[in-house]
Swiss-Prot record:
Could be a S-adenosyl-L-methionine-dependent methyltransferase. It comes from Oceanobacillus iheyensis (strain DSM 14371 / CIP 107618 / JCM 11309 / KCTC 3954 / HTE831). S-adenosyl-L-methionine binds at residues 53, 74, 96. This is Uncharacterized methyltransferase OB1106. Its EC number is 2.1.1.-.
Amino acid sequence: MGREFIDIFEDWAPLYDDSVTGKDAQYEKVFEHYDQILSEVVENSQDKVLEFGVGTGNLTKQLLNAGKTVIGIEPSTAMREIAKKKLPGITILDGDFINFPTLTMPIDSIVSTYAFHHLTDEEKEQAIKQFHEVLQPEGMVVFGDTMFETKEAKQNQIDLARKQGFKALAEDLEREYYPIIKTVRNAFEKYNFHVSFKQMNDFVWIISAKKLA
């Protein structure tokens, strides 16, 4: 369910905000246009939001500033603690994309950034099925995450990272479950979503999926 990577995020939590602001050279291109990525997710979401993978609360803060009501889900204790310090009073629950507490309000948007790739392709499909069950009619799933158009494109980025001496990035791309866009598209369409993709940098795409009937 993506929880096999929790230890990585427990260690990364104190430095995560440095990474997203470009202070970590290995991840500079991954987080390129970070503010625009967050803004794109906020602008395409509706009013009652369920956010998976809250992390240190950067997207959550923008959602709240836009006047949205947010329930956050985050499996990392260290990340939750940082987010709660940033955003006192916000509801951030222990959980993941598949296992999370019973919700206390109707949900018309499910959002996430830099987290969906922690699920295997099979788990992604299971999560998408649950998204359809949770969302109100015409609700939206809006994710920003690393994915690739082809397996070759993914391998090219791994090879480039190694050539640049970015060992941690190369190992990250090999270890975690960064998907191919066609696989994600097929999963959303299987569960009756209309889905589109928008590229934001060399790694990250925005997924916008609207629940149909």
